[in-house]
Design a protein with these regions (language model features):
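Extracytoplasmic cell-surface/polysaccharide-interacting catalytic and binding patches
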Residues: 1-59, 136-137
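Catalytic cores and adjacent binding grooves of peptidoglycan-active enzymes
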Residues: 4-9, 44, 83-94, 98-137
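Selective for proline/serine-rich intrinsically disordered segments
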Residues: 22-24, 67, 121
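Intrinsically disordered, low-complexity segments enriched in small/polar residues
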Residues: 28, 38, 78-81, 114
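Extended, low-complexity, intrinsically disordered C-terminal regulatory tails
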Residues: 51-83
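N-terminal start-of-chain detector that recognizes signal peptides
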Residues: 42-43, 64-71, 103-107
Length: 137
């Protein structure tokens, strides 16, 4: 079971949930992102994100129209694997599409980049086998 904290950017309030790994993430429509998927390889029992990041995910997933597999979203800073200012530590970054073809990743990248809901969509030259999306502030 995980404690999931969601910062509501509209009300500036924190919402706290206690969820199982197989439960959908708060604000994710349907079952397009489960708590266990959001956690990825993190060993933390406390996870956090924002409703704005989840809304950006929803828009991307709806526009793409198919499942988007991912392996990495949340990380604690001491768990490593990312730079010191990684948005994964803030719970607002998603590395997606690792299991997809290059053409499918290109389509995800184009959808995410053209929607305008993400703060940053990493250039494909920097992430050749995945797509990095984040809703940084």
């Amino acid at each position: 079971m995980a404690k999931v904290i969601v910062y509501d950017v509209y009300t500036q309030a924190l919402q706290v949930y206690r969820l199982n790994e197989s439960d959908p993430m708060p604000y994710a429509y349907g079952r397009t992102m489960l708590v266990g998927e959001f956690r990825g390889s993190s060993g933390s029992s406390v996870l956090w994100t924002t409703n704005a990041a989840m809304e950006a995910w929803n828009a991307t997933r709806r526009t793409y129209g198919s499942p988007i597999p991912f392996r990495y979203a949340f990380k604690r800073i001491w768990e490593g694997g990312h730079g010191r200012q990684s948005q994964h530590y803030a719970g607002v970054a998603f590395d997606v599409g690792q299991a997809l073809s290059s053409a499918q990743r290109n389509r995800i990248w184009n959808v995410a980049n053209n929607l305008g809901v993400w703060s940053y969509v990493e250039p494909q030259s920097m992430t050749p086998t995945w797509v990095h999306l984040d809703k940084r502030y």
